[in-house]
């Protein structure tokens, strides 16, 4: 009898929870319509994978790409709508969040064709790979719109879990297993540190979890200048630092870049930084509004360390992927300048613009590396010597992307850095901008060193990998080359296109 009553109570409670969730989805679902499209795409992928054979593999790519394109379309149709808070304050929809969601969707859309040929050659499980990519994209999108501490913690965990699985996808590779283990352990530690910082913020605000309500709670409790807030700031900065991978939170980055499959590295190298930048901007700007001097100082230290260490250590690397890992550490130092400048001097607009260019530059470089790796089986920088004599198109594409990463005019990277540094200079960050300029010159050195190898014609310097290099047939690798061409064109956009891009970015500020 007691068991029967308990069972009835359990059913009633479950029904209430289900009805409440259905009510939220029914009335608030329109606010997450782009995310719902991805969820529907995930369900379709699962159904097709569980009920069909290998002949339906093209459908898996088609559904994944279509879901991402439809999600981008839904975001664009929702452009310039009034900011809205939904799901009981857990999620906020505004133009600022949506432009970061657009960047994440753009990264994923370019990464899927980039990975098609690689997956087929390495005989990796295709359906699971696409599921993890879409789920990580979904987690990144929710992180961009997260409006409370719980969602800010759960969303990146969704992204991180998929990242761990993707980085260890080649289970038979010892380097991949080592990278995944290191990534998982450091990711778990950083999540614990982040939650500990949230607990200090939660307690100091009188039990508030929504970002704006935390500010009101700190005012009511008079704790906005307390030691507890300083402790929360330090722990949260360290936790977010793992996602952004600035120095000194960068130890996992080179190993994960080197050990993971190259398309996975391309995906993680941009999406994680875009999502973490969106989250960091909102966390520092809203709950820590009264501690702006403190978090400005912390971020300045991280930016300086990242720009110096990332670019100096990149010079010594012999692996192309490890070199790009340290290069990305230096690049995030430039992005942090935009976060520090903030809304007052166009810092956010310059950060968003540089992020857009960084996506094209980085993914274009990785597309070239994927193609070269599939045709030669090597990642060593020395093995790129003389590539221009065998494949001028690939060598020229790689050279343009590297020059754009270095910031040489008239490529897109130059104008992105120019606007970012100019905003920092106007904000009075003279020392930070000077470090950025000097380290940009250093980065140009090691990029030009690679380009010199690409263009060399000396037989004694050309390795057997390039001597035996054979271009694939015209119809092969076309998906990778499509992504590469799109990224190369975007990386070489002249400065005349900067003004409309910056104007659009400025309209997204909250």
Swiss-Prot record:
GO MF annotations, alphabetized: NADH dehydrogenase (ubiquinone) activity; quinone binding
Pfam (any one): Ndh2_N
Membrane topology: Multi-pass membrane protein
Keyword S-adenosyl-L-methionine recorded: no
UniProt-listed GO biological process terms: ATP synthesis coupled electron transport; photosynthesis, light reaction
Keywords attached to this entry: Chloroplast, Membrane, NAD, NADP, Plastid, Plastoquinone, Quinone, Thylakoid, Translocase, Transmembrane, Transmembrane helix, Transport
Reaction catalysis annotation: a plastoquinone + NADH + (n+1) H(+)(in) = a plastoquinol + NAD(+) + n H(+)(out); a plastoquinone + NADPH + (n+1) H(+)(in) = a plastoquinol + NADP(+) + n H(+)(out)
TM helices/strands, residue ranges: 24-44, 57-77, 99-119, 124-144, 149-169, 183-203, 227-247, 295-315, 323-343, 354-374, 395-415, 418-438, 484-504
Primary location recorded for the protein, binned into one broad class: plastid
GO cellular component: chloroplast thylakoid membrane
Subcellular location: Plastid, Chloroplast thylakoid membrane
Subunit annotation: NDH is composed of at least 16 different subunits, 5 of which are encoded in the nucleus.
Record function comment: NDH shuttles electrons from NAD(P)H:plastoquinone, via FMN and iron-sulfur (Fe-S) centers, to quinones in the photosynthetic chain and possibly in a chloroplast respiratory chain. The immediate electron acceptor for the enzyme in this species is believed to be plastoquinone. Couples the redox reaction to proton translocation, and thus conserves the redox energy in a proton gradient.
Family stated for the protein in its record: Belongs to the complex I subunit 2 family.
Name recorded for this polypeptide: NAD(P)H-quinone oxidoreductase subunit 2 A, chloroplastic
Lineage: Eukaryota, Viridiplantae, Streptophyta, Embryophyta, Tracheophyta
Gene that this sequence comes from: ndhB1
